Amino acid sequence: MESLPAAEVLLSGRSDRLDDDLLGRLAEHPLDSIETEYPHHVGAVDGPENPERPSDRHPVFYGCFDWHSAVHSHWALVRQLRLVEDHPDREAIVDSIEARLTETNVDRECERFDEDPTFEKAYGWAWLLHLAAELDRWDDARADAWRATLSPLEDTIVDLVHTEFLTDERPFRVGTHGNTAFALHCVFDYAQSVGDRSLETAAGETATALYADDADYPIGYEPLGWDFLSPALTEADLMRRVYDPDEFAAWLDGFLSGVAEPPVDLPIEPLSIGEDPEDGVALHYVGLNLARAWSLAGVADALEDHPAVPALEATAGRHATAGLEQAFTDDYAGAHWLSSFALYLLTRNEGGIGCR
C-alpha cells in the first residue's frame, strides 16, 4: 500500500478524504472473505453427525472464519457502497450479497437463534444491528430491498437484545468479543440511527446502571491477553454517547483520573507486533490500535474544550497510523476482519457511528 495520509486525515472520519488506493484495500479482503467458507470456527459440536457445512448452517454469513466477522464484513461492503457512489468494486459487491441474501437463507439464519438464543451474544448481535442500520441510512432502492429481506433476522436480534442483553446485571470488562460496552454502544447507535427511542432509552439506562459509578480505571494495565478492544476506552466511548458533554467530562475525570488536569497522563502507546507476526492472535493488537484510535478520537470530539483534548488527539493519531500500517495484511488470521475495523475508524463521522 502507498504511504498513509497524515494523522489529521485519518482521524477526520470522512470518506471523501481517502484516496483510491486506501478505498480499494478496504474492499479487497471483505469481498474475498465473505465467500471463503473454510477455515471456519465451530464453537460446539452436538453429535457425530455434526457439524453441518457452514454454508448450510449459515447460508448468508458463512464466510470470514466466523459468523460475526461475516456480518461485519457485509456491513463494511454496504457502507462503502453507500459512501462511495462510484466504487470500483460496486458490481462485484452487489452480485456477491444478492447471491446469498434471500428470504430462504435469512429464515435459516433465524432458525439458528431459535436453536440457541445465546449464539453470538452480544458481539455478533451488535454488528448485525450495525448492518441493518447501514441499510436504513442508505437512500437506495436496492438497500430498501436488502433491509426488507434481512428484517426477520434484525427483528430477532432486537428482541434478544431486549430480553437477553439489556437485562445483564454485570458488565464483561474484557478486550475481546464479550465486551459489554462495545455491544452496548452498537445497540445505542442502531437505536438512534433507525429512530427506536424505546431501545435507545433502554440501552442508555443499562449503560448508566453498569458504568456510572466507575472510577480510577487502571488503563496502564492494558492490554490483557490478546485484546482487540480497550476495556477502558471502549467504556468511555460508550458513555460519551449516553451523557451530555458536561456530564461526560465530569465522569471521565473520575474514570481516567490522569486526564483530569494537565499535564495529561495517559499511559498507553501503540502496540507493535513486528512486520511479519507468526502468531495470528498477535494480529488482535492491530485491531486494538485501530479501536483505541476511534475511541480516543470520539472521546476527544465529545470533550470539546477539555484540557485533555490535544493529548487524546495526538495519541489517537499515533494509534491510527500504527494500526492502518498493518491492517491490510494478507494473513487470513487478520484479513478476515481487520478491514472492517479500519473502515470503522476512517468513516466514523459518516453517520451511524456515535450519532446523535
Feature map (PLM): residue ranges:
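Solvent-exposed loop and edge beta-strand segments that line ligand/cofactor-binding
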Residues: S15, P54-V71, C110-A126, T167-A181, ...
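Low-complexity, Ser/Thr/Pro/Gly-enriched N-terminal "stalk/linker" regions
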Residues: M1-Y62, D331
